[in-house]
Amino acid sequence: MPQLILIRHGQSQWNLENRFTGWWDVDVTEKGAAEAWAAGELMKAKGVAPDTCFTSVQTRAIKTLNLALEAMGRLWLPVTKDWRLNERHYGGLTGLDKAETAAKHGDEQVRIWRRSFDIPPPPLEAGSQWDLSADPRYAGIAIPSTESLKDTIARVLPYYEAAIAPQLAAGRTVLISAHGNSLRALVKHLSGISDADITGLEIPTGQPIVYEINDDLSARERYYLSER
């Protein structure tokens, strides 16, 4: 039976600074790099052996994957990078301190923006310092100005079905290094979690989540590798 391993990137600089990150490209911290390496060591110790890997086009996820693979002695594995595995776009909240935003708009409004299923934050304003339209990695892509979790799912799941599911169907073990909300999209799909419940699911940084996948690509079991 194939396995699907999900790992959220190690702590990023803006995780540390408590800022909304979204699509902005932020590196991992020293702690985040250590989390990624430890995840690779754990997978190696537990006998998890990916055949192929997927990640976003964001540095924190790519670096987490590379560090984990290096710790496993599997840097030679094929890796596919795709923007559809990016974090949710936080729109006009990008770069803002979460506590200051709550003080300005109220805890409840910020909770709605962060944790509602289908209500996106305000859009990113034209000319913002966080505008990514000139970033070459997004050439030819209609960059969103903001996204809800529902919007994120709408790009993640078609990519999963088209690119990742066929690898699992071929019996390959797949490792995905991505982000809190793009991974929520996959967990919601695989575990059949409701719209209301998925918004409360926390995915910790640097902790491999393992899915045992049936032949029909349904999920038989989900668990944290550290608990086995």
Swiss-Prot record:
Keywords: Gluconeogenesis, Glycolysis, Isomerase. One of its GO terms (molecular function) is phosphoglycerate mutase activity. It catalyses: (2R)-2-phosphoglycerate = (2R)-3-phosphoglycerate. The record marks 179 as: Transition state stabilizer. It holds the Pfam family His_Phos_1. Transmembrane segments: none annotated. Belongs to the phosphoglycerate mutase family. BPG-dependent PGAM subfamily. Homodimer. This is 2,3-bisphosphoglycerate-dependent phosphoglycerate mutase. It comes from Sphingopyxis alaskensis (strain DSM 13593 / LMG 18877 / RB2256). The lineage of its organism: Bacteria, Pseudomonadati, Pseudomonadota, Alphaproteobacteria, Sphingomonadales. The gene is gpmA.
